[in-house]
């Protein structure tokens, strides 16, 4: 297994969990409704889109009653969790595959929810931590790192300063383009020497690990609106 195996080869028509569509449909993970709640009933394509987008944007920018440290504590408690030989078996993949969000991203990217069970899971890990802590409206949820980052950018919570609890997006090429994102995790701290300490899923040999990364590999940061 290659180091930092973050993008798996998928057969044509399968979920593009790491290579997915470029449609900015991912605002759906900011919904105020409880986890896995159904989207509003259709009231007409244009009106539904307007209402849903407005509600999602408001939710994504509403402060949650969760601190950055609480999110990092839950993420840290997962260190050592490992995938199986098929690239699956984690609770993060199992949770995502059965979530309402999986149905939404399947509609966007194609495939079937069961394909998430063995798909690249770094973004699913971040999403799971958000769900477990009650910070999901701020952390977002997706299986595709590029769309996850676009959601932060669309909600004006995207920047270049590392902060504890921020969601950090990487490109191994050093690109600063969201389209080139390969990986995602949480910032633990800025080390002040051109590196950041992080907690990431699906890194190394498919594990949750604490890492130190050069900021030259960072595309940008998503900023959840945590409780102070």
Description of each model-found segment:
Residues 69-76, 149-153, 219:
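Generic detector of well-ordered alpha-helical segments enriched in charged/polar residues
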Residues 28-55, 60:
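C-terminal region of N-terminal signal peptides and the immediate post-cleavage residues
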């Amino acid at each position: 297994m290659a180091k930092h195996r973050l993008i798996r080869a998928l057969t044509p028509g399968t979920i593009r969990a790491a290579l997915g569509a470029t449609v900015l449909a991912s605002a759906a993970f900011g919904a105020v409704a409880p986890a896995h709640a159904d989207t509003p009933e259709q009231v007409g394509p244009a009106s539904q889109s307007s209402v849903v987008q407005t509600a999602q944007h408001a939710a994504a920018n509403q402060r949650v009653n969760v601190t950055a440290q609480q999110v990092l504590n839950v993420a840290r408690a997962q260190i050592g969790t490992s995938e199986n030989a098929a690239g699956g078996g984690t609770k993060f993949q199992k949770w995502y595959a059965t979530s309402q969000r999986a149905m939404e991203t399947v509609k966007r990217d194609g495939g079937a929810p069961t394909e998430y069970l063995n798909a690249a899971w770094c973004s699913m890990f971040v999403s799971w931590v958000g769900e477990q802590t009650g910070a999901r409206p701020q952390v977002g949820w997706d299986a595709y790192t590029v769309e996850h980052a676009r959601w932060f950018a669309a909600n004006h919570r995207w920047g270049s300063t590392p902060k504890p609890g921020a969601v950090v997006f990487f490109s191994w090429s050093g690109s600063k383009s969201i389209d080139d994102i390969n990986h995602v995790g949480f910032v633990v701290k800025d080390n002040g020497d051109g590196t950041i300490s992080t907690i990431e899923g699906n890194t190394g040999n498919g594990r949750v690990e604490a890492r130190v990364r050069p900021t030259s590999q960072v595309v940008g940061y998503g900023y959840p609106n945590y409780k102070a």
